[in-house]
Amino acid sequence: MGSTDEPGSSMHGVTGREQSYAFSVDGSEPTNTKKKYNLPVDAEDKATVFKLFSFAKPHMRTFHLSWISFSTCFVSTFAAAPLIPIIRENLNLTKHDIGNAGVASVSGSIFSRLVMGAVCDLLGPRYGCAFLVMLSAPTVFSMSFVSDAAGFITVRFMIGFCLATFVSCQYWMSTMFNSQIIGLVNGTAAGWGNMGGGITQLLMPIVYEIIRRCGSTAFTAWRIAFFVPGWLHIIMGILVLTLGQDLPGGNRAAMEKAGEVAKDKFGKILWYAVTNYRTWIFVLLYGYSMGVELSTDNVIAEYFFDRFHLKLHTAGIIAACFGMANFFARPAGGWASDIAAKRFGMRGRLWTLWIIQTSGGLFCVWLGRANTLVTAVVSMVLFSLGAQAACGATFAIVPFVSRRALGIISGLTGAGGNFGSGLTQLVFFSTSRFTTEEGLTWMGVMIVACTLPVTLIHFPQWGSMFFPPSNDSVDATEHYYVGEYSKEEQQIGMHLKSKLFADGAKTEGGSSVHKGNATNNA
């Protein structure tokens, strides 16, 4: 026998007893066998309380991974906006080029959000979020190498695909938290994610200035600055993939193999999403809440820079206030919806949405008409509160439209936000027909007009803004959600998760229904 030190003589890897190291994408909790959670849960294992500063797995860990990854995507998508005064000089961009780039930045995710909805329904939100964040990283790095308007517009379009992480964010929260607190949770996750639009207004000018002071020229400094959001993408993608999990009980693939989760068909999911008229109303509503927020992120820094002759850093700070308001505005919208639902049920949620979004539109008109810096800043802050709170109030209702097709409906609604933004940017901010202040004024008018269809949303079990329920609230709630499954599908138990959701959603009838049920049970 040869020496044990001889190359090839080691038995390492043969006995299977040696310590080994590997990278896994299966997540931290592949499945769950009747485990206890750190938070109180309902029959679906969804958390019934929201502890903001907790990192308990899986619920709160998922919350933090979700909003941080979404915020990272917002930072990169709008990283160019606060640097436009420098970039336009370097690339010789015209107002038309800048407007088209703004449209491109939010148009890319119209398609990707639709795809993300299906990915969440069929594969789970963890894979969808992690892979999209990491696949977007090369496009962020590519911004450093653009040399003309065409390249600038193309790269902004490609980076915009990553905004589809919004869909995985909202879907993920809806699978982890109880319906009675979903408005607050969805609003906080999305609001803190959207806050990236404000963070980037502060971050990118500071990074640019640091690089310039280190010896780089202005036209080189802005290019190097894009490496910061690019690396953030890679880091967050790895964290989501390794630390996240799809459902409270584990990852979707593992639970499907164990028979704990039914594998659905894409055709059925798509059918129930597109044939529900409420879906399309929310697409429109979100187009003029989130959509106008995205449009404003693209123009607000340049607006203050040009109109009031401010320094780039000062304009960036003011513009950051618009995005940073998401820290509390969007959660407040979801929280207000939850509070209204406790007393007035779904009808309270609908009234809350209409009041908040209409108010935001009126403040937007005021912003466009403002003649002084102080007035413009005040009206911008109030407009941001209204628009962002309306986003929170919208996604406090979306999870109730359909249980089976939640992912695709979330994707369609999210895509509506991007489509509305692209259309608004194209009509009001991409040509010389309107000045920026005129564009803001007409955008406010459109917000008010496009919020009116909320009056048409009617749930048979809960009613609408002006009409009461058309069926008994308790029995109709189960029928509404379980009715999305055929008798054959119900026989094999595909409807059971929806039935559990319906049991929890019966509280959307309002306090009068609770009292009625208590009386009957007595």
Swiss-Prot record:
Induction: Transient up-regulation at transcript level by nitrate. No induction by growth on low nitrate concentration. Expressed in roots and shoots. It is a multi-pass membrane protein. It holds the Pfam family MFS_1. GO terms for biological process: lateral root development; nitrate assimilation; nitrate transmembrane transport. InterPro entries: MFS, MFS_trans_sf, NO3_transporter. Disruption phenotype: No visible phenotype. The chain crosses the membrane at residues 67-87, 103-123, 127-147, 149-169, 191-211, 224-244, 269-288, 308-328, 350-370, 381-401, 408-428, 439-459. Disulfide bonds: none annotated. Keywords: Membrane, Nitrate assimilation, Transmembrane, Transmembrane helix. The keyword Transmembrane applies. Involved in high-affinity nitrate transport. This is High-affinity nitrate transporter 2.2. It comes from Arabidopsis thaliana (Mouse-ear cress). The lineage of its organism: Eukaryota, Viridiplantae, Streptophyta, Embryophyta, Tracheophyta. The gene is NRT2.2.
